[in-house]
Regions:
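Conserved beta-strand signature within the Rossmann-like core of class I S-adenosyl-L-methionine
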Residues: 173-181
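Conserved class I S-adenosyl-L-methionine
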Residues: 53-62, 79
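A short glycine-rich, Lys/Arg-flanked "PGG" loop and its adjoining helix->strand segment in the class I
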Residues: 160-172
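S-adenosyl-L-methionine
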Residues: 97-137
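Conserved SAM-binding loop of SAM-dependent methyltransferases across substrates and taxa
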Residues: 63-75
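A short SAM/SAH-binding and catalytic strip from SAM-dependent methyltransferases
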Residues: 145-158
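Class I SAM-dependent methyltransferase Rossmann-like catalytic core
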Residues: 4-49
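A short acidic, Gly/Pro-enriched loop at the edge of an enzyme's catalytic core
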Residues: 136-147
Length: 217
């Protein structure tokens, strides 16, 4: 539930604001231009990997555009991890870009899971599990072939936030590909802690970000 502050500075539920914000984000995330960019992301990574993906974890999935492309091409089973609006306070959709947040008070806008699940189904997403970041419930024996995060882990918050999760659900051949924020140049990566850069998959983000393969250490 999206929340606002009352006169005593306490958070109160504001379902109308939440529904309005969800509709605005849905509009942004389903334009032809936006979806074309997401398709290009998939094509770059798919070409780089050059192999089918059986199980995929998408951290900060949103509408899971890239992950859905893997599902369409390979029948990939998807684990889609995202925040639930019911657990987060109201934030402006213009205030979050580039700021790293690691505490509950700093979490940004999310959809409710009911809205997100309905939208994923509307977009034709198949064979997926929607996972709440505040209640991660993935079976111990699930190991992913590919772990991804697009404009989320490594971009809006440090990679180390989910390093333990990545380690827990990786096998010896797991590939991890993330959008990493850069500073000044496309190779001056921010927040490299607990992992190494293996390769730059795409530098389409210019001097602000790059899509990279990483190796956990």
């Amino acid at each position: 539930m999206t929340q606002i502050k009352d006169p005593l500075n306490n958070y109160i539920d504001n379902p109308e604001k939440g529904a309005h914000d969800s509709a605005q984000w849905a509009g942004k995330w389903t334009t032809e231009r936006y979806t074309a960019k997401k398709r290009a992301n998939f094509e770059a990574v798919d070409s780089y990997l050059s192999q089918p993906v059986g199980k995929l974890l998408d951290i900060g999935c949103g509408f899971a555009h890239e992950s859905r492309c893997f599902g369409e091409k390979y029948g990939t089973e998807l684990w889609l991890l995202d925040g639930n609006q019911k657990n987060n306070v109201d934030k402006s959709d213009t205030a979050s870009y580039g700021k790293w947040n690691t505490t509950t008070d700093d979490l940004y806008f999310y959809h409710t899971f009911d809205f997100l699940d309905a939208k994923l189904q509307e977009l034709g997403t198949k064979n997926y599990h929607l996972i709440d970041t505040n209640n991660i419930d993935i079976a111990e024996d699930v190991k992913f072939d590919l772990i991804t995060s697009w404009l989320s882990c490594g971009h809006h918050y440090p990679v180390k936030t989910y390093i333990d999760l990545m380690k827990k659900h990786s096998h010896k051949n797991t590939r991890i590909i993330l959008d990493i924020r850069c500073k000044g140049t496309k190779t001056n990566f921010i927040g490299v802690d607990g992992f190494e850069i293996v390769n730059v998959v795409s530098d389409a983000g210019g001097k602000k970000r790059a899509t990279v393969e990483i190796k956990l250490i």
